[in-house]
Amino acid sequence: IDTAGKERVLHSFGNGTDGSEPFGGLVALGGRMYGTTFRGGATNGGIVFSVDTAGKERVVYNFGLGSPVVPDGRNPESTLTVLNGTLFGTTYNGGVRSAGTVFNLNTAGDESVLYNFGGPGDGAHPYAGLLALKSTLYGTTSAGGAHGEGALFSISARKERVLYSFRGGSDGARPDGGLIALDGSLYGTTYKGGAHDRGTAFSASTQGKERVLESFGSSTAGGADPFAGFYVLNGTLYGTTTQGGSHRQGVAFAMTRAGKERVLYTFGSDSAGAAPFAALTDWNGMLYGVTAAGGATNHGTVFQISP
């Protein structure tokens, strides 16, 4: 899609073996784009695929083909991360404990499980992808942890460490979105928890010291229930919430690193869409995003907004 809104379909999923339900975004590597689907493929456990700009798709890896002794991951939901020419990602299900995995994969389709979630006090079922900082990967899980409300973790050289376990109270619960790094700190959101149980924005050190920046749901105009993580532009955090706002259909917002929030746009009042679940991105100084509903056919929109 170009900035004027002209769209071209590159590939239509749905024949089964090529994957279905692509929840995550795309990353570029070696002249092709790589992504994941939650279902479909050889075992209906999802795939990693590549596609070129002409729309030629190739299945790179089928999840769910591991042996009973060393089971593979299943159902990847997130965008992949590229580190040193290798693809890294998470699966929501599968693995030794059926609680999800961290994996890496080369473009030839050789996959390796780096970590299996679900041990005592460990995170479980990651929705989000991974953040690469030098040789360490950081991420979140939507469940598990010491209190069962999700966890913040790091993984390096196949060794995982839980940095923070969410308690489900004022500190937040269900960190479904991904992390971003800014000036040495990690920033993210939780879908629930906080002072009003409508989600939080938080920062954390790479050692796991967490601080709540904002508890969503404090006013009618403000957003609530953020599913996506942040996008950084010129030192400011930008995000979306799936609900809240004066029309209760979500908002796009800006936030300082100190937690001061400013609503940029309230969804639900016109054809711009409703319920933005995904993170924002930018092009030439403008922010772009998608909504899951609303628009002329009520099937969602691609929108542009000024920061």
Predicted feature descriptions by range:
Residues 1-307:
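Extracellular beta-propeller repeat domains
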